[in-house]
């Protein structure tokens, strides 16, 4: 009888061990997947920052070129310069911005303001058709148009990756693992008027 009890206990212990191994394996696999997705979000965010930085870097040359033909449009130039300065202050603030609603909103608003200022500059440029003969301006136009398109593409890619990460960590029982190791839901770009469409820069 004691032998049967011993065998029964051994079976129970074996089942517990097997269950424990499965549980640990699942936990390790889920943790590694969360880490992988988290790194993907960071990488996509870096690409978003890079294309916004590219636009930021193009603006001084664009403004100086336009000034050569429309030097009296000081109000517009000032608006672009100020918006650029504010946008520049939101770069390189680490990926912690993705967990901070205020910081993320500040970044998004600053970039949107700069985009709006550039659109007003485009309206001014329409008054000066002779600009279209300036080779430097034409080159900047092509670069800016390409950059605006890249911004739209990289924002969409980032949103897709962030949503995939969020869905993964919110499902049970992975949500327990995510909470244990401090993985939080990521913010992403919300749909706004013009947010998913690159501004037209055809002059």
Name what the model sees in each region.
Residues 2-203:
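A helix-centric hydrophobic-segment signal that preferentially recognizes long
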């Amino acid at each position: 009888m004691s032998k049967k009890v011993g065998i029964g206990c051994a079976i129970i212990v074996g089942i517990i061990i097997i269950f424990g191994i499965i549980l640990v394996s699942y936990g390790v696999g889920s943790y590694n997947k969360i880490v992988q997705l988290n790194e993907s979000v960071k990488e996509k965010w870096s690409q978003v920052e890079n294309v916004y930085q590219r636009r930021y870097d193009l603006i001084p040359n664009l403004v100086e070129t336009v000034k050569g033909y429309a030097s009296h449009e000081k109000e517009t130039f000032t608006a672009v310069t100020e918006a650029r300065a504010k946008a520049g202050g939101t770069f390189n603030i680490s990926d912690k911005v993705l967990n901070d609603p205020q910081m993320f909103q500040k970044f998004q608003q600053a970039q949107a303001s700069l985009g709006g200022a550039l659109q007003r500059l485009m309206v001014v440029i329409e008054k000066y058709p002779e600009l279209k003969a300036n080779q430097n301006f034409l080159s900047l136009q092509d670069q800016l148009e390409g950059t605006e398109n890249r911004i739209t593409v990289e924002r969409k890619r980032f949103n897709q990756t962030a949503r995939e990460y969020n869905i993964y960590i919110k499902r049970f029982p992975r949500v327990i693992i995510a909470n244990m190791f401090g993985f939080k839901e990521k913010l992403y770009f919300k749909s706004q008027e013009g947010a998913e469409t690159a501004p037209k820069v055809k002059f």
